[in-house]
A protein has these predicted regions:
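Sec-dependent N-terminal signal peptides
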Residues: 4-13
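Positively charged n-region of N-terminal signal peptides that target proteins for export
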Residues: 1-4, 88
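Sec/Tat signal peptide C-region and signal peptidase I cleavage site
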Residues: 14-18
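Mature catalytic domains of secreted/periplasmic carbohydrate-active enzymes
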Residues: 19-441
Length: 441
């Protein structure tokens, strides 16, 4: 009898852990995603009213009843979805990811699963995701929905995780009810807004043990297989990613990195180099220092910083998802609009070296990265003080090297896999000097 039980348990385990097989549409969507290279991240919610970032409920220990007053002040009458989409498109972005529901538990869409949403609780009373979805379709921009697995508002997000412990006024509900709630909302997002690009999960890390260096054991069951299967059933092409800072789980279609180029390890919570999988990659970064609107945030990144980060992301084989935090009136800060316009001008001129490329043959550094496509390798020289470049162990067979966008040849020598390139001082660009290598395939 025991032997039979063991066999049944083993069989069940194999079934439950069966390797996820993406559909043909999903694989095509992955390729599109890798080719797209650049997207707009939008963190927007009722927290913008306070002008202190998207974590204000946690950081200021605002109680549930106190936070419930915020939606009454949220009336973004200057929100223009088409204007946002055109801003992204003119910046060279191919997709938009927007917060449908952040950690504060407030839904930015009309939901039957919870009355705590923009349509039912704000004077604005409109579904901003619906308006954005329509504008994205009109202008051929894909739309992804950010969805928080962490919730500082609901009673049934229980047991609590590591954050939000100072927020009072919540009961002790049932975890299975929370899972059902998430499934209901995800079903709405995948059925009421047309064809979407995918779901961008965040917050799983809240339930993981943390020793200051690595995430450890998880304390609850997020029912990932059930949730991921539901998403792929409703929209097989939809891409799933999760900002859990760990190796990808079965069912995920791309791997994301927060404020950290893949494998670089500049953040405490950075994903280990050993945990980088074979999925398409995406790094998200802020245009200033905050995700949600922050009135006092003056850390606006320069044109050079933003463009070089896009280039570096491509050199690491990754997309860049660049974030803005709109104001509570529905407008985006003028400084951020201007920054996106500058990126757009650069990418119109040099986008060929970014779009549809893959990681190049050299290990990326802060001074030099490479991208490649169609028999071309593009060297991006980010250090304007360099006049000579030496690349050891470069075993590609070179036909010629020229400055990208011109016919001017670049002097070089290539002996015993040691490549030396001699730059013309007059051709060095302060942001990015791009060399086009014609490679024998």
């Amino acid at each position: 009898m025991k032997k039979h039980i063991l066999i049944i348990l083993l069989f069940t385990s194999i079934i439950n852990n069966a390797q996820y097989k993406p559909s043909k549409e999903n694989l095509e969507a992955r390729k599109w995603f890798q080719d797209a290279k650049f997207g707009l991240f939008i963190h927007w919610g009722v927290y913008s009213v306070l002008g202190d970032g998207e974590w204000v409920m946690n950081n200021q220990n605002i109680s549930k009843s106190e936070y419930e007053r915020l939606p009454k002040f949220f009336n973004p009458t200057k929100y223009d979805a088409e204007k946002w989409v055109l801003m992204a498109k003119n910046a060279g972005m191919k997709y938009i990811t927007i917060t449908s529901r952040h950690h504060d538990g407030f839904s930015m869409f009309d939901s039957n699963a919870s009355d705590y949403n923009i349509v039912k609780k704000t004077p604005y009373g409109k579904d901003i995701l619906k308006l954005l979805a329509e504008a994205c379709r009109k202008h051929d921009i894909k739309l992804f929905f950010y969805y928080s697995q962490l919730d500082w508002y609901r009673d049934d997000y229980f047991p609590r995780g590591r954050t939000g412990l100072g927020i009072n006024g919540r009961g002790e509900g049932k975890w299975e009810n929370y899972i059902d709630f998430m499934k209901a909302q995800l079903t709405e997002l995948l059925t009421n807004y047309g064809k979407i690009g995918g779901i961008w999960f965040d917050g799983q890390w809240d339930q993981h043990e943390w020793d200051g260096k690595r995430f450890g054991k998880i304390n609850v069951d997020f029912k990932l297989k059930e949730v991921y299967d539901l998403i792929h059933k409703l929209q097989p092409h939809a891409l799933i990613g999760s900002n859990h800072h760990l190796a990808p789980n079965p069912g995920e279609d791309f791997q994301m990195f927060e404020k950290d180029l893949p494998g670089k390890g500049t953040k405490d919570f950075a994903t280990s180099k050993n945990d980088i999988g074979n999925l398409p990659l995406e790094v998200c970064e802020t245009i200033n220092g905050s995700w949600g609107f922050n009135l006092k945030d003056r850390k606006h990144k320069s044109e050079k910083e933003l463009i070089q980060y896009l280039i570096k992301a491509a050199g690491y084989g990754s997309n860049l998802l660049l974030n803005v935090g709109p104001m509570p009136n529905g407008e985006i800060q003028e400084e951020h609009i201007n920054s996106l316009e500058k990126i757009g001008k650069w990418i119109k001129k040099f986008g060929e070296t970014i779009y549809h490329t893959r990681k190049g043959p050299i290990d990326p550094t802060d001074q030099l990265v490479s991208t490649r496509k169609d028999g071309k390798v593009f060297l991006h020289v980010l250090d304007s003080s360099k006049e000579n470049i030496v690349l050891e162990n470069f075993d590609e067979k070179i036909r010629s090297i020229k400055y990208f966008g011109s016919n001017q040849k670049v002097k070089y020598s290539h002996k015993k896999n040691s490549l030396k390139i001699y730059l013309d001082k007059e051709k060095i660009n302060n942001i990015d000097t791009i060399l086009e290598l014609d490679i024998k395939i």
